[in-house]
Amino acid sequence: VHTYQWESRDLAPDDDYNGYNLVYKPGAKLTRTGRILQIHTGAGITGDFVGGSAGDYAQMGIFARYLIGRDPLQRELIFNDVKRALRKLDKMSMGPVDIALWDIAGKVHGAPVWQLLGGWKKSLPAYASTYHGDENGGLDTPEAFADFAEQCCEMGYRAFKIHGWSHAPIR
């Protein structure tokens, strides 16, 4: 597992609510941490996964030794055994490992993972998304969300995902 960091500008935790949601905050700088999982085979092939949380990777310590010497192409066997090992946990660490094993399979078979999974589409529609609503001059009103949605539509997006205010009243 490798970690890397980068700086995001104009982004900060929402201090007005719970400190977990990221919101637009002009002038703010936020250091973010990312992770790369690499699984190396005895044949010299490396499977990669980029993403995941610190908690996901902490769980991997429970079953990392199990992976040593296993056939990485036996993804279902590995999945079922690890599922049992993590039966009392949320199993969030299984996804990154599974994707890295699929990456190995793609490299072994000389095909992209989407082909191994039976994919046929050459493109997929994209959508625009927001950070959470805030109260600091970013997406701070329904009108601001509407203006941003119109701007995204002008940029060619045909769908728009809203992350509203976390502290909004439940209706």
Q: Model-derived features: where do they sit?
A:
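Glycine-rich, charged/polar anion/phosphate-binding loops
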Residues: 22-23, 112-113, 146-147
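Conserved residues at the C-terminal ends of beta-strands
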Residues: 2, 52, 163
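Metal-dependent enolase-superfamily TIM-barrel catalytic cores that perform enediolate-based chemistry
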Residues: 123-124, 128-171
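Structured beta-strand/loop patches that form or line metal/cofactor-binding pockets in enzymes
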Residues: 1-43, 47-48
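Solvent-exposed alpha-helices and their adjacent loops that cap or buttress functional pockets
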Residues: 29-30, 117-120, 154
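Residues that cap or flank secondary-structure elements
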Residues: 32, 93, 140-141
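Metal- or metallocofactor-binding catalytic centers and their adjacent structured scaffolds
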Residues: 5, 24, 40-109
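Glycine-rich, aromatic-flanked loop segments that form ligand/cofactor-binding clefts
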Residues: 98-138
